[in-house]
From Swiss-Prot:
Positions of substrate binding: 93, 119
Keyword field: Cytoplasm, NAD, Oxidoreductase
Protein name from the UniProt record: Formate dehydrogenase
A Pfam family reported for this protein in Swiss-Prot or TrEMBL: 2-Hacid_dh
Principal location class: cytoplasm
GO cellular component: cytosol
Enzyme Commission number: 1.17.1.9
Subunit composition and interactions: Homodimer.
UniProt catalytic activity: formate + NAD(+) = CO2 + NADH
Marked site (Important for catalytic activity) residue numbers: 258, 311
Disulfide bonds: none
Role summary: Catalyzes the NAD(+)-dependent oxidation of formate to carbon dioxide. Formate oxidation is the final step in the methanol oxidation pathway in methylotrophic microorganisms. Has a role in the detoxification of exogenous formate in non-methylotrophic organisms.
Length: 362
């Protein structure tokens, strides 16, 4: 079979750390394993445009593997072109770069799987870190020191505690709930969540969280909002100028879910105006982010309020070890035709939805 892996280039960093599996050089640790089985293996970072390596190899690819950190956008046009395609694997969590609805509607016998749970702890930790970086005004403080400065007042005037704040999550699934668990130790005033379904009574009581059914009511009550929901048709552009009007003035917003859940220009404008005191996260649209992306340069009135990073929250080394092994497990099941996948990994099975996170059969 022809297996195409779309990963990012790491250069010398791949030699520095052999467990940097998400790069072309280390190829999820499975290139030799695949080739020894006789598969035709293509590993590339070149994924955009008609002349890309991905485009040139998609017509006869049986399997395409990508990551959320350097996503291969599998569009309707590419699906139509990929006549032999049977399996799409996401080495990580998040299949929104694939046109899942089109696969479902087309009747194609294509399965989509991801390595569920491989980076939930990694992302949850990054969420809490980003909150602290924003609320404590860490980035300007660090930049001040690097540049040789020392002005405590300049930093302290825009620095606060997390304790005593109302913190809300949009999405309380595997990642969102782990964020709530970690926030308990900070003694917030209240923890809120917005989701299509309630947590169990036991889960709610464990973290002391309260469900809010209306998203506008949720953001109006929160000092800090964190986005932890999947990207799908219903969540794309969810955080826009209209919703931002309902945020408590001067709130902080953290997004490690997907960049397209927020309208980039609207968020940048809200930070500039002071409606948001700051925005931080690691997800962008598209990825890699263009040099003129508004989130690269956005700032509040103090020149602060920006805690953006490249998309790496779920790509720390521990997570890469987990999603590399999970990808190999999926491939073993596929190649041996056992198809005994972990149920939680299946997004589409033979073109049919097996999860409520992204859509429903058409």
């Amino acid at each position: 079979m022809k297996v195409v892996l779309v990963l990012y280039d790491a250069g010398k960093h791949a030699q520095d750390e052999e467990r940097l599996y998400g790069c072309t050089e280390n190829a999820l640790g499975i290139r030799d394993w695949l080739e020894k089985q006789g598969h035709d293996v293509v590993v590339t970072s070149d994924k955009e445009g008609q002349n890309s390596v991905l485009e040139k190899n998609i017509s006869d690819a049986d399997v395409i593997i990508s990551t959320p950190f350097h996503p291969a956008y599998i569009t309707k046009e590419r699906i139509d072109k990929a006549k032999k395609l049977k399996l799409l694997v996401v080495a990580g969590v998040g299949s929104d770069h694939i046109d899942l609805d089109y696969i479902n509607q087309s009747g194609r016998d294509i399965s989509v799987l991801e390595v569920t749970g491989s980076n939930v702890v990694s992302v949850a930790e990054h969420v809490v870190m980003t909150m602290l970086v924003l609320v404590r005004n860490f980035v300007p403080a660090h930049e001040q020191i690097i540049s040789g400065g020392w002005n405590v007042a300049e930093i302290a005037k825009d620095s606060f505690d997390i304790e005593g704040k109302v913190i809300a999550t949009i999405g309380a699934g595997r990642i969102g709930y782990r964020v709530l668990e970690r926030l308990v130790a900070f003694n917030p005033k209240e923890l809120l969540y917005y989701d299509y379904q309630s947590l169990s009574k036991e889960a709610e009581e464990k973290v002391g969280a309260r469900r809010v059914h209306d998203i506008k009511e949720l953001v109006a009550q929160a000092d800090i909002v964190t986005i932890n929901c999947p990207l799908h048709a219903g969540s794309k552009g969810l955080v826009n100028a209209e919703l931002l009007k309902h945020f408590k003035k001067g709130a902080w917003l953290v997004n490690t879910a997907r960049g397209a859940i927020c309208v980039a220009e609207d968020v940048a404008a809200a930070v500039k105006s002071g409606q948001l005191r700051g925005y931080g996260g690691d997800v962008w649209f598209p990825q890699p982010a263009p040099k003129d992306h508004p989130w690269r340069s956005m700032a509040n009135k103090y020149g602060a309020g920006n805690a953006m990073t490249p998309h790496y929250s779920g790509s720390v080394i521990d997570a890469q070890v987990r999603y590399a092994q999970g990808t190999k497990n999926i491939l073993e099941s596929f190649f041996t035709q056992k198809f005994d996948y972990r149920p939680q990994d299946i997004i589409l099975l033979n073109g049919k939805y097996k999860t409520k996170s992204y859509g429903a059969d058409k």
